[in-house]
Amino acid sequence: VFAVVPAENASGVTQRYQPLMDYLSKELGVKVTLRIAADYAAVIEGHRSGNIHIGEHGPSSYVRAWTVTNGGVEPIGTPTDSNGVTGYFSVAYAKASAAGAKLEDFKGKNLCLVDPNSTSGNNVPLFAMNKGGIDPEKFFAKVTNAGSHENAVMAVQQGTCDVAFNWWNSEDDSNLSRMVNKGMVKKEDFKIVFRSERIPGSPYIMISSLPTDLKKAITSALMDMQTRDKSVLDKLTDGKSKGFAAMKHSDYQVTIDLQKFVDDLRKKRGS
């Protein structure tokens, strides 16, 4: 069973990932099914219970899964961008017509985060705001979790949020560009008012208790996807990836530190 943390709506997830299920089923000789998860926690819990064997995560949800399974999951690799580089960014979107040009200009407005286990939609923003002296609970009128990256953008579009955090690779490779391609929004309606430093790439991971030969087969199926069936990779990444780059747990040390920071922040706030 394969699951992915929610970035887009269920039909979008199915269209993007079903070719991967067919490809993995063929390569592994065993049927791989797609589980649509309601939130990040459902995928993490699925790994812990052993019901979800392979998953695509953001760095923070991988680290959370690694923590709750006592190291019972391992990263395989992450898709590179069109230049063969791994990693991505957290950005904040506002309406193009909004008065502010940077995050600090949106005092007293409504902020949308994505999910408590989202890296670009929660942890990086909280860290960056803290560093910039912003306490979101006091600085903004209201802070809400949109639930997915698409929902966060839609909230800005509909005016329920003035600013929303999201993942972003480049001008033509982001959640926003995917939504534009699907006809959901217009690019010119939005502007970026914050961009983070580069975040480690979102890993595909598997539970460590799988048989060794199966783990090897899963790894080679993903790492060699570019040569074995490029159409699957293109579907996953909107044709914006040069293939997978191998990742190991130590590559996520910065995310582990970030997770600790956010957890400590929550404890301080008593939430």
Set out the residue ranges of the language-model regions.
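Short helices/loops that flank or line small-molecule/ion binding pockets
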Residues: 41-55, 68-69, 88, 104, ...
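Flexible hinge/capping segments at coil-to-helix
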Residues: 94-115
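An extracytoplasmic/periplasmic, membrane-proximal ligand-sensing/linker region
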Residues: 1-3, 8-19, 199, 206-271
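Solvent-exposed coil/turn segments that connect beta secondary-structure elements
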Residues: 7, 57-61, 81, 95-98, ...
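A structural signal for short loop-to-beta-strand junctions that line the ligand-binding cleft
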Residues: 72-85, 191-195
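Extracytoplasmic small-molecule ligand-binding "clamshell" domains
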Residues: 1-63
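Extracytoplasmic/secreted proteins, especially bacterial periplasmic and envelope-associated proteins
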Residues: 12-19, 23, 42, 46, ...
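Pocket-lining segment of extracytoplasmic ligand-binding domains
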Residues: 110-213
